[in-house]
Amino acid sequence: MNSRVLFGSFVPVDSVLHRLDPRLKLVTCFWYVVIIFFAKGPLTYLLLVAMLGAMIGLSKVPLKMYWAGLKPLLWVIGLTIAIQVLFSSGGHVYWHWGLMAITSGGINQALVILARFILIVLASTVLTATTPPLRLADAIESLMKPLKKIKVPVNQIAMMISIALRFIPTIMDEVNTIVKAQQARGVDFTSGSVYTRVKRMVPIMVPLFVGAFRRAEDLAVAMEARGYDPDQERTRYRQLTWRRPDSIALAVVVIVSVLFFVARILL
């Protein structure tokens, strides 16, 4: 098994979460992200963490793989926290200099954003790690099927999402390959000013975009050679079927959601 998992990567292991209907997992993930923004106070966040911990445990994907998937985003998290801490107002002022100030309100907002960011990323990673891209695309198409009545191109949207999810880990792997190649040539991405570091990213971005366009063109040629027609209804080898474990999982999600909103109201 690969030692890391990135958003968009499917990890083929046998687990309860892998066997659930992809439509249920997709709706649950979407609902989980929505209620994150309704969280208020330690108790509601504790429920969210417990729910996410249960999903991670049921997925049977090692924790170090989730950490490896979250690690590349640490700089985004750090930058977001720094902006919130230095430029948010409210509460007791601990330090002040010009437009920047460290306040209790800014620290609280930074912690909330940090918690939301990590929960959203990990929940999305659980979804993509336990659901193959094609099954996820089928789930999206199935859930969006009523929109066909108003002429929404559901098939094309589902295919685009499937391709995007498939390309995310591929592009990330290509970034790692290019970075290692540049480092082997003596390029140091960790030293120097911000401008210098950004300038050193150019040798990464150019081959990355060239490779992405080349892969997209190859994929388009392959799909055309196989007779893909976006206007035709696709057939599926594996049909989506709702089973008893899916109903049990849905009931658990509903119960946890009720507990979440009860805890929020009582705060």
Swiss-Prot record:
Cell cycle among keywords: no
Transmembrane segments: 30-50, 67-87, 110-130, 152-172, 247-267
Main localization category: membrane
GO function term, MF aspect, one: transmembrane transporter activity
GO CC terms of this entry: plasma membrane
InterPro entries for this protein: ABC/ECF_trnsptr_transmembrane, EcfT
Membrane topology field: Multi-pass membrane protein
Localization (cell): Cell membrane
Record bears the keyword Amino-acid biosynthesis: no
Record key words, sorted: Cell membrane, Membrane, Transmembrane, Transmembrane helix, Transport
Protein's job: Transmembrane (T) component of an energy-coupling factor (ECF) ABC-transporter complex. Unlike classic ABC transporters this ECF transporter provides the energy necessary to transport a number of different substrates.
PANTHER family with a match to the protein in the record: PROTEIN ABCI12, CHLOROPLASTIC
Family from the record: Belongs to the energy-coupling factor EcfT family.
Subunit structure: Forms a stable energy-coupling factor (ECF) transporter complex composed of 2 membrane-embedded substrate-binding proteins (S component), 2 ATP-binding proteins (A component) and 2 transmembrane proteins (T component). May be able to interact with more than 1 S component at a time.
Descriptive protein name: Energy-coupling factor transporter transmembrane protein EcfT
The organism of origin for this protein: Limosilactobacillus fermentum (strain CECT 5716 / Lc40) (Lactobacillus fermentum)
